[in-house]
Regions:
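Short, charge-patterned binding micro-sites
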Residues: 2, 40-61, 93-94
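Short glycine-/aliphatic-rich beta-strand segments at the starts of folded cytosolic domains
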Residues: 3-13
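C-terminal binding/interaction regions
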Residues: 20
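Hydrophobic alpha-helical membrane-association signature
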Residues: 23-27, 68
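Short beta-strand elements
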Residues: 35-42, 84-90
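C-terminal structural segments of small proteins and small subunits
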Residues: 57-94
């Protein structure tokens, strides 16, 4: 099974793409390191104040994958202060 978490972020403090990269890159590194998920910026690469990031995991237990990605989402929501979540979605493919 493959599980994905897609998060649409609003980055109000970013006035340039360079600032945006400086904000998003540490978040992606931290999620990969702390939660052992694959991460990438998926969309809106040319927008200064928005980003869409994705996290992915594979496994054989849908409930575990759902729970693990919920943990990632909650961490971003509670601990990441550089922006806010506009929308989030978890999908599981079997």
């Amino acid at each position: 099974m493959l599980a994905t978490l897609t998060i649409h972020l609003h980055l109000p403090g970013c006035g340039s793409l360079k600032e945006k990269r400086g904000t998003i890159k540490p978040l992606l590194s931290r999620l990969h390191r702390e939660f052992n998920v694959s991460v990438a910026e998926l969309d809106l690469q040319d927008a200064h104040q928005q980003a869409v990031i994705g996290c992915a995991m594979i496994g054989n237990d849908a409930a575990y994958l759902q729970s693990a990605l919920e943990t990632v989402r909650r961490w971003v929501e509670s601990n990441w202060r550089e922006g806010e979540i506009i929308e989030q979605r978890i999908e599981i493919y079997s």
